[in-house]
Amino acid sequence: MSLESFKRSIELGRQGFNQGFSMGLPKLEELIGGITKSTMTLLFASSGQGKSSCVLYSYIYAPLKEHLEDNKLRIIFFALEMKEDFIIAKLLSTYLYDTYHIVVTAKQILSIGKDYILPDDLYEYVQLGYDWLEKVYKVLTIYEGSFNSDKLIKVTMEELKKEGEFTENKYIPKDPEKVILSVTDHVGLIQPSNGRNRKGEIDDYTNKLVIIRNKTGLSPIIVMQSNRAVANMERKKNEAFMEPMVEDIKETSTVSENSEIILAVYNPQVDKRTTYRGYQVKEMGYRFRSILVLKSRYGENQVADCCFFDGAVNKWMEMPKPEEIFDYSRYRATNNSSIDNIIKNEDKDEKVKSKLDYSL
């Protein structure tokens, strides 16, 4: 890089080209810079802790909410685990809650369940979301099914060609300000090919993504499942080390080495913990999640963003500091949604209310 190139980078930053997009979680945005161009992110968790839900909320729903119609966002989603219909239903569930304050789960939207059919009153709300979804489909493209490294890279390149031109030495985007995300959920389901085992396939895929990232400004988000079984008994003796660590990443370490940002989703109640970093998590009825920043090349490492998580509508909200919480009852689940319980109880304690900002 020449001095002139460096000076240009500074000028582009002053023009706002390096500003991150919203993730719906202000503290996390401050820690990692939000969603930025040319940044590879690894997000992992053990099974059932909410890794896919976190990605759907912070890397898809939140930026869609902010950039749905300005043509500054493009999302390519490789769904190796979930079906496209269920992904869209989860996004719609969050949208309906944010817009109409109505709780309709993804399973309800799709009438999933024994003898369950979506009732007319909820169906009317679902129909109100169709116009929003029509706009979503213009920004978000979902590919579901079985993929190997070569197929994932081929589709990624085809999508990038729609957004710019590849020359012999560089990539010329149609809009330099546009952020293009590729989400792979989860990469552990990638299919081995060409004589490679699964580790080799993941390594091949992520190594090629690094090259594409450097050339095009693509921001890959890689979702992985961790292997908590690697934690030995010595680690279990110290509760601080019960949190996920980079060493827990399943299959391969190459992904972590290639990533600028590594996040881990953790539910301390899975480890039978009643308290966590000062929070009375047992009082929250399985609604507490910690998003751990294990690696960030542009900010702090080894810090936690402690969140309230309502799986019914896939809503994530950052918690106040533990010393600012005087009543945990508001965080418990109700018959509809635990978020409703937060709102209903906000007027009970003005001292607490003044310190809470859920941005609903």
Residue ranges and their predicted role:
Residues M1-Y100, L128-Y130, L356-L360:
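The Walker A/P-loop phosphate-binding site
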Residues E30, E66-E177, C306, D340, ...:
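Cytosolic-facing regulatory segments adjacent to core modules
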Residues F77, V183-T184, L218-Q225:
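Structural recognition of the conserved hydrophobic beta-strand(s) that form the central parallel beta-sheet
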Residues F17, T141, Q191-D203, E234-E243:
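Flexible beta-alpha connector loops of hexameric P-loop NTPases
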Residues I76, I172-I212:
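Helical hairpin unit composed of two closely spaced alpha helices linked by a short loop
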Residues L42, I180-D185, I221, L263:
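Structural motif
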Residues L189, Q225-V230:
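Signature of the SF2 helicase/ATPase Hel1-core->accessory helical subdomain module
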Residues L3-S5, Y97-V103, D131-E134, D150, ...:
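C-terminal regions of RecA-like/P-loop NTPase motor modules
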